[in-house]
Amino acid sequence: KLGIPIIYSPIRGVHKRMLKDLRRYTKFYSVFDWAPHSNWASKLFVKRMNKVGIKTSKMTNPTTLELAKIVVDTSYYGWLINYAQISQMIASKHEVDYDEMWSFASEIHKFLGNRPKLFPGFIGGHCVIPNLDLIHDKTLDEIKKMNSLYSRKIKK
C-alpha cells in the first residue's frame, strides 16, 4: 500500500491531434476512496485541469474507469471496425460496391443515429488490439481473430 493517492486518468484522443483532443474531451479520472488524502488529490486534480480549460468527471473507482476505457472505448471501436471489415468482405465476395451498399443505412443513421458507417481496414496501432490483452475475454478476442482474417483476405 502506498502512502500517497494515485489518480488514474486514461488518455482519450487520437495521437496525431493529441493536444487538441486533450482539451476537447472531458478528462475522466478516479482514485480509490481508501487512498490517503484522496479528496485532497481529487480537488487538486480538478483545479489544475480546470485552470487549463479541461473539463473533468470523476468515476467511482479506477476499475470502473479502466473497464470504460477498454470495453466501452477501444474494444467497442474494434467491434465496429470488425463489422466494417466483414461487410467489406461480403461486398467483395458478391462483387458489389461497399460504399453503395452502405448508402442504404445513411438515412436510417440520419434519423435514428444508430447505423454509423465505419471504414474497413486493418486494425493496427497500439490501442485497440493491445488493450484486448488487458481484459482477458474470449468473446472480445474475436476482434483479433477477425482482424487477422481480414488482413489475409485483403492481401489476396
Regions found by a protein language model. Give the residues of each.
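C-terminal substrate-binding/catalytic lobe of Rossmann-fold NAD(P)-dependent oxidoreductases
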Residues: 97-155
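Internal alpha-helical scaffold of NAD(P)-dependent oxidoreductase catalytic cores
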Residues: 2-113, 141, 145-146
